[in-house]
Regions:
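Exposed beta-strand and adjacent loop surfaces of beta-rich binding modules
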Residues: 117, 387, 492-494, 505-507, ...
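Short, ordered beta-strand-loop transition motifs
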Residues: 489-490, 516-527, 579-586
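Proteolytic processing hotspots in large secreted/extracellular or virion-associated proteins
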Residues: 479-483, 513-570, 601
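Sec-dependent, cleavable N-terminal signal peptides
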Residues: 1-19
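A sequence-level/structural motif corresponding to short, flexible coil/turn segments enriched
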Residues: 17-476
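C-terminal beta-strand-rich structural cap/linker in extracellular carbohydrate-active enzymes
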Residues: 586-603
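Surface-exposed loop/edge segments in extracytoplasmic proteins
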Residues: 569-578
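Predominantly extracellular/luminal regions of secreted and cell-surface proteins
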Residues: 484-515
Length: 603
């Protein structure tokens, strides 16, 4: 007996099938003008599969912004560099795209006598600079951008920290219009009148702006999460603070790294928080649109050591996914990815330990339309030191594949410091700007709607020092071969292809939005049909096996169950039944094409 209650409430979704092959489509490297150090920090992908990467590139003993565009085949279309007026270090932190193909990059740039300033640039689709907007605090202190987001009208929002020399660092959030004109600026100085640093930003559907980071609250709690909501005019609506459970003699640092907002206006924040005896733990919080805490969830990994959450994403069902790394005594640092339900209940934790039982740090996360989870970062394999490591999990937290990238240098080394980042599939920002030694480290990731995965970061080259290394992966759950079997765990459907000559992807949906049911027959489940599609190229027959629920039928009805295939040319439901397994509740049929399928019973 197999109950269908698990998928009846989710019947409109397509689900990725359980066996998936990952294919490296291309790798492109960007080496700046002096064969010196180039580090990709953020990326975005447009609807046509064009890929945009930004980072810092060394030239004449200083770093410049360097932004590149690649087409869907990985061919460079243009590269644009920006050297600020101070002719010194310029560090981009985020990239975003608008609906018209314009590209926006932000970060911090050394000014002419103004130390570091915010520097936001707009390029058109051909890489031609449209405007540069700089922000310098009146005290000429260091102004450092950490994050950016765009709205549908092309307005640009940036946030970070600004040093005013009196109250030290303050949150500083700025809104520009599409022409680069500053519309408003909002600052936040916390109750401790000390360092306050905004690390991430998000928008809701109503134009409200949400910023999070850390704020010094005083000697008792030190740095706390501080999350702020502004309306579209920059007016502060609320501030929500979170202080973890530790206190003296512990450091009591609580540092928020990432934020996202769901379709209902729920606000999710994650980072790391001092737990006292448990050291630093993941701490994830959900607020409603009024800033009222809905739940908080902490994660302490094995060994009561350092657990740092770097990124968060929420799917359309309200499940929250967090990733970062967790330290223990046996395998050092491992990726640790967690799924929470809408009430903050932990559903699963998936860890990834590379080959060396050494340091593995996840930097960013994304979720596809089927709630499969993708995580990237860098992993120590013991032989060639740090490599890119990208992991796919299904919606149950089971590891489906791991893709690693080892650059051409294969030099021993280790990246220095802690990586932090946020992801919303359009924008990624990350922490430490320069690793200390030779390695390959992935910082940023994006997905497209075709299921392709894009990863970028810094990779040590052969005589070129560090280069951008950007990778496109595709996925196939239906690979070439004979008797190829794919199984959907949600709907209990298994397909067996006689021959697949061209690999592709197969999806199964249980839906009420299909052709009318066969006349005079009842469908199982009620009023539902199965829509099955594939992009694979196949020959000969496909066997379809569907699990059914027999709780509302007699034994006589079960013995007459039919599996039917919809034929659009004749508007008929054809009987394709080959056998019934009434012990395991599976019905089988054969078809030469994929379409809508239905399990029917005579009322």
């Amino acid at each position: 007996m197999t109950a269908l209650s698990l998928f009846l409430s989710l019947f409109v979704l397509p689900y990725r099938l359980s066996a998936v092959d990952v294919i490296e489509e291309w790798v492109v490297r960007y080496n700046g003008p002096e064969n010196s150090d180039d580090y990709a920090k953020a990326m975005a992908v447009d609807a046509s599969g064009n890929v945009y990467v930004t980072g810092l590139s060394r030239c004449d003993s200083h770093y410049d912004y360097a932004t590149t565009k690649y087409d869907s085949d990985g061919i460079e279309q243009w590269a644009a560099r920006y050297n600020g007026p101070g002719n010194y270090h310029d560090t981009p932190k985020a990239i975003a795209l608008d609906a018209f193909g314009n590209v926006y990059v932000t970060g911090y740039s050394y000014g002419d006598g103004t130390s570091h300033d915010y520097a936001t640039i707009k390029y058109n689709s051909n890489g031609v600079e449209q405007w540069v907007a700089r922000y310098n605090d009146p005290d000429n202190g260091n102004d450092v951008v950490h994050a950016m987001v765009l709205d549908a009208l092309g307005n640009v929002y940036v946030t970070g920290e600004s040093d005013d020399n009196d109250s030290r660092l303050n949150y500083t959030t700025i809104k520009y219009n599409k022409d680069g004109r500053q519309l408003w600026m909002a600052t936040y100085n916390g109750s401790g009148n000390y360092n306050d640093s905004a690390r991430a930003i998000a928008l809701d559907a109503h134009g409200n702006v949400y910023v999070t980071g850390y704020s010094y609250s005083g000697a008792e709690t030190h740095e706390d999460y501080a999350t702020i909501k502004y309306d579209s005019s920059g007016r502060q609506i609320w501030v929500a603070k979170y202080a973890g459970p530790s206190g003296p003699p512990y450091s009591a640092y609580d540092i928020a790294n990432a934020i996202t907002v769901d379709a209902s206006g729920g606000v999710y924040v994650t980072g790391y928080s001092d737990g006292g005896a448990t050291s630093y733990d993941y701490a994830t919080i959900k607020y409603n649109s009024d800033g009222i805490e809905q739940w908080k969830a902490r994660y302490n990994g094995l060994g009561n050591k350092y657990d740092y959450a770097n990124a968060i994403v929420v799917d359309k069902f309200g499940y929250a996914y967090v990733t970062g790394y967790s330290e223990n005594l046996w395998t050092r640092q491992d990726y640790a990815t967690i799924k929470y339900d809408s009430n903050g209940r932990q559903l699963w934790v998936a860890t990834y330990n590379g080959n060396a039982n050494h340091n593995d740090r996840a930097c960013s996360i994304a979720v596809d339309l089927s709630s499969n989870v993708y995580v990237t970062g860098y992993s120590n394999d013991g032989g060639t030191s740090l490599n890119y490591a990208t992991v796919m999990y299904d919606s149950f937290g089971d590891e489906i594949w791991v893709a690693t990238y080892d650059g051409p240098a294969n030099t021993q080394g280790q990246a220095g410091g802690t990586v932090t980042g946020t992801s919303d599939n359009d924008q990624l920002t990350s922490g430490n700007d320069v690793p200390e030694n030779d390695c390959d480290y992935a910082y940023a990731m994006a997905l497209d709607r075709q299921g392709n995965i894009y990863v970028t970061g810094g990779s040590f080259g052969d005589g070129t020092r560090y280069d951008y290394a950007t990778i496109k992966y595709s996925q196939e759950d239906t690979p070439p071969g004979s008797r190829v079997q794919v199984a959907d765990r949600i709907t209990g459907t298994t397909l067996t292809f006689d021959t697949v000559v061209g690999g592709g992807n197969t999806t199964v949906s249980v839906t009420s939005d299909g052709p009318p049911a066969p006349k005079g027959l009842k469908l199982v489940p009620s009023d539902m049909v199965y829509e099955i599609n594939t992009t694979a190229v196949f020959q000969n027959m496909i066997q379809i096996a569907i699990v059914y629920d027999d709780t509302e039928m007699t034994q006589q009805q079960e013995n007459t169950l039919k599996l039917r295939c919809y034929e659009p040319a004749t508007d008929e439901w054809l009987d394709i039944t080959t056998r019934r397994d009434t012990v395991n509740n599976i019905i089988y049929g054969n078809s030469r094409h994929l379409s809508f399928f239905a399990v029917s019973v005579t009322p």
